[in-house]
Amino acid sequence: MPKTRLKLLLACALAACRTGAPARGGDPGAQAPVVPGIDPSIMDPSVKPCDDFYAYACGGWLKTFKLPPDKPAYNRSFTAIDERNLELLRALAEQDAAGHLDPADRYPDKVGDYWAACMDEEGIEARGTRDLMAAFAAIDEVKDLPSLARGLARLHRAGVFPAFRIDSTQDARDATQIIGEVAQGGLSLPDRDYYLKDDPAAQGIQKAYRSHLTRMLVLAGLPADEAARQTEAIYALERSMASAQWTRVEMRDPERTYNRLNLAGLEKAVPHFPWAIYLSDLGHADLSAFTTTTPPYLDRLEELFDSTPPETWRAYLRWRLLATMASQRALPRAFTQERFEFFSKNFTGAKELEPRWKHCVRSTEGALGFALGQAYARRYFGEDGKEKTKAIVSGIESAMRNDLAEVAWMDQPTRRMALAKLERIVNKVGYPDEWRNYDRLQVDRSSFFQSVLGANAFEVNRDLDKIGKPLDRGEWLMVPPQVNAYYDPQLNEMVFPAGILQPPFFTRGAPDAVNYGAIGVVVGHELTHGFDDQGRQYDALGNLKDWWTPSVGAEFDRRTACVVKQYDGYSAVDDLKVNGKLTLGENIADLGGVRLSYAAYRAARAHEAPVAGFTPEQAFFVAYAQAWCTATRPELLRLRTATDPHSPERWRVDGPLSNLPDFAKAFSCPEGSGMVRPAAERCAVW
């Protein structure tokens, strides 16, 4: 399974831009209005806090906020920070592109050239499909299985992954070793179920997708009848792939998705595919140690390699390249607009394309994120915030230590192992100690298409080069400006990039109640991931190992079944319910995160005065809830219900708090209130 990245960031939490570019230097909070940790003006006093706390804390904002037309969702905290960061990063990239290079920055010339290539819409229009046709010509060399292997390797090398994915990963049984991973993939729709379900909504999306595919092929130069014929062949191939893939819930099982094999085993599983040719053309002929996430998918690949004619493979490879480059907005506007219309209507609900400059900030950050991130961190990240965050982390780890020492349902052997794991957790805050080397990344200022392929190729090669080499424990999986955080179970580490360590999550000089309610819960959330239904399966060294005695493991499962049942009962959108099994890990982390942060706050604080008219205890919970105020279009809610391991924001607030006696006490909520679950139904894991 690819290295687990358990994230807080909403997949589409984007927002309207602020006009004007900020000056370089200073605090990002000085560049744009910041969102306060607690804002009474956005609350709805007509709602009782004990009935629906999310509506109480966010209701005024939800009633008045208008989603910008280019946004599928807007989160009051994540999106507000993201928007400020986009402005700051834009200013850095523009200055580099203009040739005003700061010698203290890393690779400003490459940052500037990549940004300029992305922003050159006239140049992209003028080049037309020239680069695409050159890549298609290489795909047209696919005439048999050896040439198909070369064609797949060429595309995989360029970060386009038809048929399957290949990556590096830590060996789940020996986390010190880096091996290769062959994983299910190759689909164009967001999830396998979009191909397999036969309800009216799914059939509508399937029909719309085939029409979209045909229109894209026509834009790429095919006659309409030939485009329609290729569409049906491509769709049939993708649907066959989808039918052998595991669901997102099945893919959450680290035991099931760990299947170690060597090159001979890979060749035995898929004998028709010339793996030696593929690996040689990939540039990694020496790879010999692998895991695969989905053995049945390898069986399906074997069938497809044996039975699918070369002309279908050529059509499919061309489509996957075309779709990838259109998603990067590296093709003329007609491709971008066609793709937007399909995805917005069926999956996001956005009414307009995101402004080009915002896309280019994200693309530049994706290609050269640690170069841009070094400049960002040097100018805008305050070290005092880093030290305060470390203190909060320490306090929350102490709360977890106390919890593990006292929890009644855990026996001593399991408790010792849990405490040992907690003591070995590594915390990374702000930015890495060593910055990524981009010497080998090739950027072509005159061609955004080639720059995207160059950046993709650099990253694929960097990733695969790790196989067989010593584990780099200093590597970060997120760039510093990212408004996010994660726990990695195989490295047993928590990472808090600089991007999230600003208002409203962390506010210098704010009362502890506010900071613990916001960034403190983020910390508690990530810490709990180390002991959720997935994280608990890894030991202190990051190895997949059952260190729980059977009776304690059974009790853990009983407690998590309560969480599944609770969230299964929540409405997501229309007639769709939250998937309690898909969201289980995040729901456990939400439950544990708020409880641990509240315990740490109570242990750390001296007497605090009321905050914005609330007691300190109440202020903690208001800050927590207001961090999740989110407006989301129904199209995106439907997509998230099918694919996102996070619950909708309302339930990320009301779900945990309705299980928490400390919340009920803070607001004097009586038994029977909407925010007080019956004692027999109350869920508690950590």
Predicted regions and their residues:
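Intrinsically disordered, low-complexity linker/terminal regions across diverse proteins
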Residues: 31, 234, 269-272, 284-287, ...
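Short, Gly/Pro- and small/polar-rich lid/capping loops
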Residues: 29-41
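Hydrophobic/aromatic-rich, well-ordered segments within soluble, folded domains that form packed cores
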Residues: 42-63, 195, 199-218, 584, ...
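Sec-dependent signal peptide recognition
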Residues: 3-11
